[in-house]
Amino acid sequence: MKSYFFLLIFLCVSCFEKNTDIDRLNNAANNPFRKDSNKIRDKYRNPIDTLTFFEISRDKKILEIVPGSGWYSEIISHYMKNTKNFTVAIYDKPPVKILNKIQDEFINYFSLNKDKFGEINVIKIDNNYELKDNKEKYDLVLTFRNTHNWLDSGNAKKLYKSVNKILNKGGVLGVVQHRANENSELNFKKGYVKESYLINLIEKQGFELLEKSEINSNSKDLKNYKKGVWTLPPRLVEGENNKAKYLEIGESDRMTLKFIKK
């Protein structure tokens, strides 16, 4: 009877902690200080479901690789506030000029808004696509819609091999990437990648696929645009040409993959 009582207490505490964590993640996604232009994309990017799928937790050391303008960083940093457990990896020498501006704006934005989001640690990716961090091992590494660039430049294997080195044993890698049709030819310049191709490449760098999700799928995505995935929102590179059509399609069809370090 006594053991049953303690089991009941344990289950109640676990349930409370889980609910508290979900509430905290919801609060981070609904943070009033998030940019409005980011909030309106939640219906496409599904941040709460995606981060829950990747098993985000405040007691984990988390690394986001190439955060861009900080769409996900706004949410993760607020969720991880006061833990000092959230780090981003940016390029030491960006491969294209526009990334200099994007990275500078990212650093300035989050430095000026620590009280609104939380502190973010920064490490660098060197010219050999090695993650330079001699201090930490991470429990969860995330990257969103970046892999086509690394594949196009021939650096994806090196980058994911480096991720494997800085993950703790049993650590999780979460990847979201624009998804090509399986019968299509490889063309990373369009932004799309075959799911089977990417799984195979990442597993060869010391990972095992744990699970995949259709959280970010979009069956309306035709994937046959001359200007690639950037034809769709939010970029809409064709301007007013067929804008209504592309808005109706929405953002790209994306794979959502969860790997574990072997």
Predicted regions mapped to residue ranges:
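S-adenosyl-L-methionine
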Residues: 100-130
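A short, conserved alpha-helix within the catalytic core of class I
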Residues: 126-127, 149-162
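A short acidic, Gly/Pro-enriched loop at the edge of an enzyme's catalytic core
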Residues: 131-141
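Short glycine-dipeptide loop
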Residues: 59, 82-83, 167-173
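Conserved beta-strand signature within the Rossmann-like core of class I S-adenosyl-L-methionine
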Residues: 87-89, 170-179
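Class I SAM-dependent methyltransferase Rossmann-like catalytic core
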Residues: 21-58
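A short glycine-rich, Lys/Arg-flanked "PGG" loop and its adjoining helix->strand segment in the class I
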Residues: 77, 156-169
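Conserved class I S-adenosyl-L-methionine
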Residues: 58-68
